Amino acid sequence: MSTIEERVKKIVVEQLGVKEEEVTTSASFVDDLGADSLDTVELVMALEEEFECEIPDEEAEKITSVQQAIDYVKSHVKS
């Protein structure tokens, strides 16, 4: 079983079609990885599916970087 960080990064690579080395914890989905609003919605949906959780819209709007996604999952998902 891979770590939450590895799983989140893998989803970002798959959803945004970026290279793995571009996906650093400080990377912003929009500014650094070129995501648009639809990409970010699809990314949140993929995170929900992978981690079997529901991310409310008001929380999803706050997840704008790889680290924020990792932190959200760590604090809301039972490992």
From Swiss-Prot:
Keywords: Cytoplasm, Fatty acid biosynthesis, Fatty acid metabolism, Lipid biosynthesis, Lipid metabolism, Phosphopantetheine, Phosphoprotein. SUPFAM superfamilies: ACP-like. InterPro entries: ACP (IPR003231), ACP-like_sf (IPR036736), PP-bd_ACP (IPR009081), Ppantetheine_attach_site (IPR006162). It is found in: Cytoplasm. The modification O-(pantetheine 4'-phosphoryl)serine is found at residue 37. Residues 2-77 form the Carrier domain. One of its GO terms (biological process) is lipid A biosynthetic process. The keyword Cell division does not apply. 4'-phosphopantetheine is transferred from CoA to a specific serine of apo-ACP by AcpS. This modification is essential for activity because fatty acids are bound in thioester linkage to the sulfhydryl of the prosthetic group. One of its GO terms (cellular component) is cytosol. Pathway: Lipid metabolism; fatty acid biosynthesis. It comes from the Bacteria. GO terms for molecular function: acyl binding; acyl carrier activity. NCBIfam families: acyl_carrier (TIGR00517), PRK00982.1-2 (NF002148), PRK00982.1-3 (NF002149), PRK00982.1-4 (NF002150), PRK00982.1-5 (NF002151). Carrier of the growing fatty acid chain in fatty acid biosynthesis. Belongs to the acyl carrier protein (ACP) family. HAMAP family: Acyl_carrier. This is Acyl carrier protein. It comes from Xanthomonas oryzae pv. oryzae (strain PXO99A). The gene is acpP.
